[in-house]
Design a protein with these regions (language model features):
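N-terminal anchoring/stem segment of glycosyltransferases
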Residues: 1-67, 77-85, 134, 219-239
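Conserved hydrophobic/aromatic beta-strand scaffold that supports enzyme active sites
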Residues: 74, 114, 129-131, 175, ...
Length: 239
């Protein structure tokens, strides 16, 4: 399995938040046992941290109408260049943090080419955490075509495709348990629905969200991050 992070910016640099989160991500993934060769960070500029270097692609992978769609553009480019191999890739946002190990032995895509969660009680797809294989190339292209046609984001585009079961796309997509992209929406119902231990949480490190996840200031009065990850956040000034 490969862990994939994508950041394309016309300014050819990380914004202030992501400049911190890229270090959090790398330290976190290494502490979870990921090998450096299995951590793939794709940008349109050079960057190195902990001896992990970014794979640099062109600015054409930036999506003007919805910047989050840049990850779909970039995956298509990686596929066309033969840089996606015959294994599972876990794409997640920089503000999505793995909490516990996920291995190819414990995680199965089955016959699916593409897997992700929804928002729990909200049925819309959540593309902040996606598992995919190279056989999903046409799905990625359908998403891109739909976003470009309607100038919409990738989550809306995917929902449009699955609602009409375009080209029988639904048979190739696996809906994952909310544990793989746990957010603070609908906390109580989603927490009890989540397979434990929760594998991945998703939040921007603003003070209110740090309080929510790191200090347990939520309806469950529960700290939702392991001490290991809290130490990494603290190391990089997120407290």
């Amino acid at each position: 399995m490969k862990n994939l992070l994508i950041y394309i910016n016309p300014l050819k640099n990380f914004d202030s938040e992501t400049a911190v989160l890229v270090k959090v991500q790398i330290d976190n993934l290494l502490s979870l046992g990921w090998k450096p060769k299995d951590i793939m960070i794709v940008t349109n500029f050079d960057y190195t941290y902990q001896d992990i270097k970014t794979l640099v692609l062109g600015d054409e992978n930036y999506c003007q109408h919805h910047p989050t769609v840049s990850k779909i553009y970039t995956i298509i480019t990686l596929l066309k260049k033969g840089l996606i191999k015959s294994e599972i890739y876990w794409l997640h946002d920089f503000d999505g943090y793995q909490l516990h190990p996920v291995t190819k032995k414990s995680f199965k895509l089955g016959n699916a080419d593409f897997a992700l969660t929804d928002y729990g009680r909200m049925p819309n797809w959540s593309t902040g955490s996606i598992f995919f294989k190279k056989s999903s190339k046409d799905i990625m292209e359908w998403i891109k075509q739909t976003t470009d046609k309607y100038h919409t984001d990738e989550e809306t585009a995917l929902s449009m495709l699955t609602r009409q079961n375009f080209q029988e796309i639904n048979s190739r997509i696996k809906k994952l348990n909310i544990s793989y992209n746990f957010q603070r929406f609908n906390l109580v119902s989603n927490y009890f629905a989540a397979t434990k231990p929760i594998k991945n949480v998703h939040f921007h490190p603003s003070p209110d969200k740090v309080d929510f996840f790191m200090y347990g200031k939520n309806k469950l009065n529960k700290i939702l991050l392991p001490k290991r990850l809290i130490r990494i956040f603290n190391k990089h000034g997120i407290k």
